[in-house]
Design a protein with these regions (language model features):
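Membrane-embedded helix-loop-helix hairpins and adjacent transmembrane boundary segments
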Residues: 1-465
């Protein structure tokens, strides 16, 4: 255990060190929020992959494989990989907008009311997503140290708040780049060791109920739902879109997205396999502890240290991206809307750091209240995506749209999505499908009615040349 902890502590100190280094690169708020719009395709792919391969795609997938989904839990990540490849078709339009936030673009086209609603949805969802990643990190710390889970949550939250506070998007991007390679290496080398120490593949398979080995146990409807869910959240979620805004050009946005999708698909089933190994070797543990238990009990200390550093890096990366998303949206959209004036650049930088701290404290509170990982992830994705989805994407892609079409679609989509989620997805239809469908239909109907009545076309989403 000492070796495992030594590796993890060295990793943590390295991340804090990168935060201090990134702080020296921060000259203004554009550097803090967008890394100066200088990300190349490899850096973009790395930061996207590390951000999206978070607690849900590591600890969450392993726990679902241990539990009700079995091997098919890997489709949760494959779906995300497919979705982010699809986002490559709209990525250049995002970059062309030269914006900082999703609500900023919505505000340009549909007005301040739409911008404020989208901002609130984004802040609530990103805060919840930060809490999910803190919970995933804390579950590892809890198993390794024996600390009370609530204490582990507080420690994990404090670390991610600290290095995001220091370096903003530069620290997030640099740590993401390092973290992605740790994730891949850690998981790739863990499987053969875990299999061998659990008694070999034949023994592991013999200990697992046959239905847990079903490749598509979760069902094609759920898989399709996840693809739609992730396409929506990657194309409207601030922590993902902010990275496209930070790309150095439109071509970079396309190739970074495609490369990220490929990397995620290659990684997808590794956590699921480790979850099944945990089921075979430790059939009576808590689901969320599956990955950490395999690491501690079945892997050599050095390999366990690398794997758990990879898991912690994945969750911290996602958490930092969401913290920064909240700061960006509040400063660029909420503050400007409420107080009717923009902050001076250095004042904006200070305010952004303050918001990171406040959001981090709030996320720790959410994490202390609820330790569910994937259910909270899906609910957060539903909140932030179902309403703004049609308004944001059609606002980028279609010239002839009206302000009221955007506002109506945001309200209707959000209400339908949240209501459907509260009703626990009647008829097996995911809330994100119902909400986004309602949003799209509302947008198209209102837009057609208003265009026929001669209502003015909304201003463009793009800055003037």
């Amino acid at each position: 255990m000492t070796i495992i902890w030594s590796i993890i502590i060295v990793y943590m100190l390295a991340m804090v060190g990168i935060g201090f280094y990134a702080k020296t690169k921060i000259k203004d708020s554009a550097d803090y929020h967008l890394a100066g719009r200088r990300l190349g395709p490899i850096m973009l792919a790395g930061t996207l992959a590390a951000t999206e391969i978070g607690g849900g795609s590591s600890v969450g997938v392993a726990s679902k494989a241990y539990g009700e989904w079995g091997l098919s839990a890997g489709w949760y990540v494959v779906s995300a990989g497919i979705a982010i490849i699809l986002v490559s078709f709209v990525a250049p339009f995002m970059r062309r907008a030269m914006a900082t936030t999703v609500p900023e673009v919505i505000g340009r086209r549909y007005g301040k009311s739409s911008q404020l609603i989208a901002s609130i949805l984004s802040i609530v969802a990103s805060s919840a997503l930060t809490a999910v990643q803190i919970t995933a990190t804390a579950s590892i710390v809890h198993v390794l140290t024996g600390f009370d889970l609530k204490l582990a949550i507080i420690i994990s939250g404090a670390i991610v708040v600290f290095y995001t506070f220091l370096g903003g998007m530069w620290s997030v991007t640099l740590t993401d780049f390092v973290q992605f390679f740790i994730i891949v290496i850690g998981f790739a080398i863990a499987v053969p060791f875990a299999l061998s120490n659990a008694g070999g593949m034949e023994h592991v398979i013999s200990q697992i109920p046959k239905e847990q080995l079903g490749f598509t146990k979760i069902g094609w409807g759920t898989i399709l739902g996840f693809i739609v869910l992730y396409f929506m959240t990657f194309s409207t979620g601030q922590e993902a879109v902010q990275r496209y805004y930070a790309a150095k050009d439109e071509k970079t946005a396309i190739w970074g997205s495609i490369m990220c999708g490929g990397l995620m698909t290659l990684y997808a089933f590794i956590p699921a396999v480790l979850g099944l190994i945990a089921l075979a070797a430790f059939p009576n543990i808590e689901e969320n502890s599956a990955l950490a238990t395999v690491s501690v009990e079945l892997l050599p200390p050095v390999i366990a240290g690398i794997l758990l550093s990879g898991v912690i890096s994945a969750t911290l990366s996602s958490a930092s991206g969401n913290l920064l998303a909240v700061a960006s949206v509040y400063i660029k959209d909420v503050h400007t809307n409420i107080f009717k004036k923009e902050l001076e650049d250095q004042a904006e930088l200070k305010a952004s750091r303050l918001i990171v701290v406040i959001t981090g404290v709030g996320a720790i509170g959410i994490s202390l209240f609820s330790q569910q990982i994937i259910p909270l992830l899906v609910f957060a994705f539903t909140i932030r995506s179902t309403g703004p989805f049609a308004a944001y994407l059609l606002g980028l892609l279609v010239e002839r749209v009206t302000k009221n079409a955007g506002l109506a679609s945001i309200i209707v989509g959000t209400v339908v999505g949240i209501t459907w989620e509260i009703l626990e997805n009647p008829f097996g239809i995911m809330a994100v499908i119902m909400g986004s469908s309602a949003s799209l239909i509302t947008f198209l109907v209102v837009n057609q009615i208003e265009l026929r009545r001669g209502v003015d076309i909304a201003p463009t989403a793009y800055p003037k040349e």
